Structure formats: C-alpha cells, structure tokens
Amino acid sequence: MNASRVSSPPRPCFGLTRATGFMTAVVVACLVMAAAPGKARAQEAPPEASEPTSLPPPLQLRPHQQIAPAPAPLLPAPAEATPLASGAKVRTDVLQTINPDTVGTLTVEEGGLGIAMWSGTSRNLVDTLLPRLPVNAASAAMRSLMRRLLLSPAEAPRGESESGGLIALRIELLAAMGDLAGAHQLLTAIPKRDHNERLIRIDADSRFLANDNHRACNLATRQIAERASSYWQKAFIFCQALAGEHQKAALGVSLLREMGAKDEVFFSLVEALALGAAADMESLPDPSPLHLAVARAAKARLPADVVSSNRPGILKTIATSPNASVELRLEAAERAEAMGSLAVDTLRQLYTSASFSDEELANPLSKAEAESGPLSRALLYRTSLVQTVPTAQAEVVARALSLAREGGLYASTVRVFLPLLKRIPPSDELVWFAPEAVRALFISGEHQAARIWFDLLRASSKYDKDAKDALAALLPVAHLAGYKDVDKWTTDRLIGWWRTIKESKEAGKRATLLYSLFDALGEKVPDEAWETLLEGPQRITVAMPHPALWYRLAFAANSSKAPAEREVVASVQPNILVNAEGVDVEAPLAAAQAAPGIGRRRLGETVLLSLLALGESGPGAADPVVLSRVLSSLGTIGMAAEARTLAIEAALAGGL
C-alpha cells in the first residue's frame, strides 16, 4: 500500500545492481532456485483466541490427516437410455465438454434456484451486474439470497464470454462475503481448476485469511515456477520467511524492489520477520489477505485504521487476530457478525474476554448509556451473564437492544443475547419487557417462544392500559410476521393503530413503512389509512436505484410469469435428454417443479436486481417505495417467504 507506512529495523544490503529488461525472469528464476533445497514448510502456531476456521486442503495435496471428501459437482450423470415418445422433436448434437460456469453445490431441495434460473437473461447483463452484488450488506435475508444465487448449479446465461469466467466470479464473491466454506465447496466442484490461476489465487487468499499458511504455501510453491506475477512472488517470499529461509526471502524482496515493486508494508514486515524484531505499522487502511498473514506471523500490531476495510472476510480475520487490540477486534467482530462472516459464538467469546474496572462492572447500565460502542456492548453482555434475577436480566437485555437499534446493530445484538433471552421466564412482573422480547424473537425466527410472551401481553392488556397500548402497537408486526390468527387482526384495523401511535416519535415515517410493507405483500391497506398521512410533508428526499435498474426489475419480475425456455437435444447417446452442454437436465427440472418460483424465466435476474436495489444498506435503510418494488417482485417469482423475511427485518429496523 503506497499510503501505508511501517517502521522497522534497517534493511540488509545485498549490493544488487539495477535490473535490466529481463529482471522479471531473473526474479522468478532466483525464487525457483531458492525453492529447490526445500519447499516452504512452516505452519504458524495456532493463535490463543482464534476462531476455528480450518479449510479442507486442495485435492492435489496429500496431508497426513484424512478429511471428508468435498461435495461433488451437481452435474448429474446420464441415466439409462429411455425411448423418446414417438414424434418428439429433438436435435442431435455431440456431447460437449461440461462448461465450468454451470457448476454448483446447492440442490433445489437445499434452496438452490434451479438449473434454468438464468433463462431469458443475457450473459452481458450478468457480467455487468453480478460483480456489483452488495456482499457486505448487514442483512441475514439478503445474505441467504446471495448465497443461493452464487451456489446454485445453472445453465450459463447465453452470450459470448470466456468459459470459466462466471464460476471464478461467483467464487470471488463468496470469498468477499467471508463465506470461505461456500467458496471452497464451489472450488472443489470445478473440473480442471488447477489450470485457472484466478481460481488458485482465490484459494490461496482464502487460506491466508483462515490462517492456513501451510496449504497456502503449498499453492504458492507450485505456482512460482509457472507464473511471474508479483502476487505469487510475494506469497512465495513470505513462505520462505515462514520456513526460516530468511536469506532467500531477503533476496526476493531486494529483487522485487529493484524491479520497482511498491509494497513497503509487505517488504518491511518480511524483513521484521527475518530479524525477529517487532514492526510498528502506522497505517494499513486496505489490507490484503497476504498483508494480514505476514503481519500476524511477524507479530506486528495492527494499526487503528485497519478496520477502515468494509470487506466481511477481512474484518473476520482482524477479529480473530491476536496482534490486534481488544478494541479493534471487537469493532471488527461486530461488523463481521452483522455481515454474516463471523460466527456469533466468536463475538460472544470476544465480549467475555474484554476487561473492565470494578467501577464499570458496578454501574454497567449507566456506563453503556454514556459511552455507546463495542466495549459498552461487551460490558452489557458480561453483566447479563452474571445476573441471576430475571428482572435484572431483562433490564440488561432491554438496554442492550435499545442502544443497538439506535446504532444500526439490532439484529446482530439480538443474536448475541438470544440464549439469555430464551432463558428469561415470562411472568406478570415482566409484562413491560414482553414487547421487546416478542420483537427480538420474531427477527430470530423463534416463533414458539415469541408466542408465549405475546400471550402474556395479551392477557395483561385486559386490565393494564400500558399493556393494552403496547399490544395495539405490536399487533400489525405480529400479523406481518405471519400470526394470522392473532385477535382476528386485519389491515382494516390500521386506522385504529395509527390513533394509538400518532403522537409518538417519527410516527408518520413508521406508518408509511408499515403500510408499504403490507401493500407489497398483497394485503390491501385502506385508502383512509393512507389519507391520514397526507397531513405530513409533501416532498421527501430518498436514495433511489438507477431508473434503468428500477425498470429492469419490474420487467424481469413480470417476465417470470412465463415458464422458462428449455431446449431439448439428443446427444450421441440418442435417448438421453441433455442441454447444449451435455448435462442431463430432466431430473433437476422435474424436482424443481415442486419448489416455488423454480423454472420461471429470469428468476436469477429478478433476485440479482432485487439485491442491487436494496444495496449495501439493506432493507433496514431502504425507502418504503424501494422496499415495495423489491418485495412485490420477489412475491411475483414465488418467493413470498423470502419477501416476508425481508419485511420483518425492515419493520423492526424501522422501529415498528
């Protein structure tokens, strides 16, 4: 990083002259010769408090420990030949090599979008829009849709493009999401992946992020003899340093410098690793996986700006790096968990590892109120663990959720406190806590537990005015979550709901959101309910998607009402139905008929456009007009359940 600086001991001088025009070849030759006596072999000792993130080794390696085989590609083998119906129109074609872009690991039964999900969509549109997928959105529902979109086996969209380019992009996006397991599953399912440098580099980066230096170095050792890119040169130099071959690593660094390579952070860290001296990094605003791996090996303290990165995979690695301060690890961990790349148990462990003074532990609620931040949330979590009285537990959870809602971390904080929340017994003394508990359990999908608290609130509402008002405010959210039988509530009662909440803070904004969500899910909102909102401002400023994306989403959703086109051809095995790539599609398509939405035209396109319309801010920050278009589009393609999940996220993030 040109803008980054590292203070380290003076570099050893090797007295090299300026490189000539063939210096690149010299560098590679020197590195290959240096590798001859022995390949990089060091494996860093496991960190003291690191999340277990080991990945299965590449198939070509032979580690001592046996591991379970990677999932096979979902490209079904042809079944026994069966006669076609008399008169059936088929086209004879030669069975072609399988296109790697069609490979996937998620079956329809597991949530895959089906082999025809790109039917009707051009390759140019996919190549243009898929790289813009909002991989760092803090929405569990969006992340689930992205994962299904990227892991589903499907016929590649039609158009001219390099074979293998789409599968590589899908794996890159999974890795960018921090879903290293999903990326590895897809990698191992690709035939002849060893010939694709782009895929091998993704594999190496994933292993550096997972602190799996041993296998990353195996990849680098094999690649350095064939490829001269600076990435593999630097990776191999790091591996030499890990193996204790510091003179060879220093020679490689000097040669790269002679060539004019610019990466002083990397060079200084490698030199510090060789000299066994601590490196003091002043700045590293956009770290690469290799930077983090070298810094960890060199025990270099990560600078404060390292969390400027907004990449889930990078944040996850920072959160589990022992060479980062507690404050940095907590901030990175909260953001990584919210983006779905870090297990919630790891965040809980980091919360419990934070240290606090006796004064802070004695007054946790006031401390958290005064200084909202990662350490304050850690303090509240620590406090909740030592409380044994249900009322005290409820007070801590309620305060934590209230502060998290203000800070945009509501869903993540609910996941952290969920085990404790489920242990708090509903009682008459805790009626005040029931609305908060119900909302938190709704967004967690814990509907049975939510129902117990809801029934407590409903029973209390018969004699307690506060409980009655709380119930009235909660009923629309309960209906939105799927509780259709609750007090026979319908949208006709929205006018009464408005009277209950209209004096509260941002009532008009919340009503607009709620009405839009119901309308998008196909539940009629009375005209009179909308009319009451006309008393507010007549103009508002909102962030809207580009008009072209807005139009295309409506077009794709409406086009999905027609069944997907399928071309039936006969291969050289004349009685097997295959597509143009020679893949048996009848079995997957037959199974897909039972899944809602599967087999529709532009299914994948509609999902992709919906995710782009919501953007990185997710449903919690989307304007009601945008939400309405996205949810109705998903409903049109048969994804009503997914639309409702997004609606719940939006409603609770919006204060409903």
Task: Cite the ranges covered by each PLM segment.
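Residue-level signature for tetratricopeptide repeat
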Residues: 173, 202-207, 239-240, 440, ...
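Generic helix N-cap/helix-start motif at coil->alpha-helix transitions
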Residues: 160-167, 192-202, 226-235, 262-268, ...
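Solenoid-repeat scaffolds in large eukaryotic assemblies
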Residues: 180-183, 213-217, 246-252, 449-453, ...
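Extended amphipathic alpha-helical segments with heptad-repeat/coiled-coil character used for oligomerization
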Residues: 215-309, 475-495
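Extended alpha-helical solenoid scaffold regions that build the rod-like backbones
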Residues: 298, 302-509
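Solenoid-like repeat scaffolds
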Residues: 111-121, 135, 150-159, 185-195, ...
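Long, acidic/serine-threonine-rich intrinsically disordered regions with weak helical/coil propensity
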Residues: 38, 47-161, 165-168, 330-352, ...
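Structural motif corresponding to the intra-repeat A-B loop/turn of tetratricopeptide repeats
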Residues: 177, 210-211, 243, 444, ...
